[in-house]
Amino acid sequence: MTAQAVSPFAHLSDADVEQLGKEFDAIHQEVYNDLGERDRQYIRTVIKMQRQLAVAGRVLLLASKNKPAWAAGTACLALAKILENMEIGHNVLHGQWDWMNDPYIHSSTWDWDTASTAEAWKHSHNYIHHTFTNILGKDKDLGYEIMRIDPNQEWRPGYLLQPLYNLLLMAFFEWGVAVHDMDVEAIRAGEKPWADVWHDIKGISGKARDQIIKDYAGWPGISALATVALERITGKVRSANALRDSALGGFTGAMRANFTANIIRNVWAHSIIFCGHFPDQTYTFTEDEVKNETRGGWYLRQLVGAANITGGPLFHLISGNLGYQVEHHLYPDMPSSRYAEIAPRVRDICERYDLPYNAGPLSKQLGMVHRTIARLAFPGGRRKPKPGPYRGGLRPVKPTKRPGQLSGTAA
């Protein structure tokens, strides 16, 4: 039995949907007409700041035998990795900055500090996820093929372990993302040509090799050499055995720091991304429900299939502006720095058309996500109540009864 939710836009006529689509298109065009130097300065400043944090972290980790230096270096490195993946890499690969015609800050040339190849990410995320957002059986991000996060998904015994899968995915998120585009279900069904599978394997193995060498051999090796050089210069260590021990300490200290920074980045990215589509407020769809979908209908699906996270400017920066997940799904190619600017206009459209605007603090959204994952590990599950139309101040009214049905994310 499927869990059903009252459609949040069943009250809209075809003319309403068409007009709504035109209004959303107009916002996009107005922003693009206004892009200029302040936008260029923004992304270049963020990239510069990220590099400075990375350099500071690496320098501090040259003294990784010292605990305060190790902690500070690890923190700088973790923050640098978060910025690189969330606000820079993800958004550059969306083509948000292609309008600059900068050969370096461009979706066709950018590579990022994570295990996933840019090519695989652009296919699984930019194309599959953003095209088929929240469509059951089409959007592979709904549970990442290992978890049941919607009561409309058929239960299988393997889902009993999904709370454990979730913890492992949280810690090693970059590796889960790296293999995501493999499309395991298509391979099992024999629908994916082996030439494509082999191409994916080569891409994953090559990127994995580079990441492992960089984080767990290259930088630790540099730290070990720097430790030995410093102690030789200062004359603190004279014997060969002592130098060897110092080198080993520098190597392992840097390696532990890189591992810790990667885990911190993975947990943060997992938390922000899962809060984008899995909280109670969001809707899922069947393929039949989106047949003959118009441009306005696409906007509506993106609007109610996503959920925002409220927070201040610093939070939005380190979350890659994915606290504005609604705006990001409406305009994935718009510079992320503009989402806060257009959010009031999106809310205004929601209010005028009696549509929900999904948002909540991180603690609330994340709590709902983990509760849903735990509950739907078992058979059954019913949808949670959905918010009603937006009515200013991020306070939706109570749901109203309307005809029409849509699938509902629930626990």
List where the protein language model places each region.
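Non-transmembrane, extramembrane segments of multi-pass ion/lipid transporters
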Residues: 27-34, 184-195, 284
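Alpha-helical bilayer-embedded segments of polytopic membrane proteins, i.e.
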Residues: 40-85, 160-175, 202-271, 406-408
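Flexible loop/turn segments at secondary-structure boundaries
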Residues: 68, 266, 270, 277-283, ...
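Membrane-embedded catalytic scaffold of the fatty acid hydroxylase/desaturase
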Residues: 79-204, 290-382
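Intrinsic disorder at enzyme termini
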Residues: 386-411
